[in-house]
Amino acid sequence: MDKVLNREESMELMDLLGLDRSAWGNIPVMRKAYLKKCKELHPDKGGDEDKMKRMNFLYKKMEQGVKVAHQPDFGTWNSSEVGCDFPPNSDTLYCKEWPNCATNPSVHCPCLMCMLKLRHRNRKFLRSSPLVWIDCYCFDCFRQWFGCDLTQEALHCWEKVLGDTPYRDLKL
């Protein structure tokens, strides 16, 4: 996510969206702010045309960069996306046993927290640069990116963001 726009462009986009810069990377929040600002800045509604054009350019560049970086087969379906082996209880979908899954993920646990953390460990050996939020959706990358402690409140925020994220983006 930190390579989609340069630092100046990302700060400018967050300012245009009216969001705190700490929200950078929270795509659902950025999308809602973008749609709201489109209504405010639209020239037909008395808004600033130049700001609207710049915001559209930066947002589309960010959106396209995320698609290219994280969805090389954008628009196609993978067989792993059609069905899943999660337990039927939605409470255990994200984290089966708090805080055990957060501190010591298990290969035998079907929760997203364990699967994403184990996937993170495997992927970090294949890359020369460190994994960051949006490259990796694990709870640790989320906490590091947004500066959260290991708390249930952070867990609930992570669950909310994952709930708004398409399954294919998780790269499981």
UniProtKB/Swiss-Prot annotation:
A zinc finger (C4-type) spans 101-114. InterPro entries: DnaJ_domain (IPR001623), J_dom_sf (IPR036869), Papo_T_antigen (IPR003354), Papo_T_antigensf (IPR036092). Residues 12-75 form the J domain. The modification N-acetylmethionine is found at residue 1. Its main location: host cell. It is found in: Host cytoplasm; Host nucleus. One of its GO terms (cellular component) is host cell nucleus. A zinc finger (H1C3-type) spans 120-141. Keywords: Acetylation, Activator, Early protein, Host cytoplasm, Host nucleus, Host-virus interaction, Inhibition of host innate immune response by virus, Inhibition of host RIG-I by virus, Inhibition of host RLR pathway by virus, Metal-binding, Oncogene, Phosphoprotein, Transcription, Transcription regulation, Viral immunoevasion, Zinc, Zinc-finger. One of its GO terms (biological process) is symbiont-mediated suppression of host cytoplasmic pattern recognition receptor signaling pathway via inhibition of RIG-I activity. One of its GO terms (molecular function) is zinc ion binding. Promotes efficient viral genome replication by modulating several host signaling pathways including transport network, interferon production or cell cycle progression. Inhibits host PP2A phosphatase activity and thereby prevents agnoprotein dephosphorylation. Inactivation of PP2A also results in the transactivation of cyclin A and cyclin D1 promoters. In addition, antagonizes the RIGI-mediated IFN response through interaction with E3 ligase TRIM25 leading to the inhibition of 'Lys-63'-linked ubiquitination of RIGI. The common region of ST and LT proteins comprises the J domain. This domain is essential for multiple viral activities, including virion assembly, viral DNA replication, transformation and transcriptional activation. This domain is also required for cyclin A-transactivating activity of ST. Interacts with host PPP2R1A; the interaction inhibits PP2A activity. Interacts with agnoprotein; this interaction prevents agnoprotein dephosphorylation by host PP2A. Interacts with host RBL1 and RBL2. Interacts with SMARCA5. Interacts with SDHB. This is Small t antigen. It comes from JC polyomavirus. The lineage of its organism: Viruses, Monodnaviria, Shotokuvirae, Cossaviricota, Papovaviricetes.
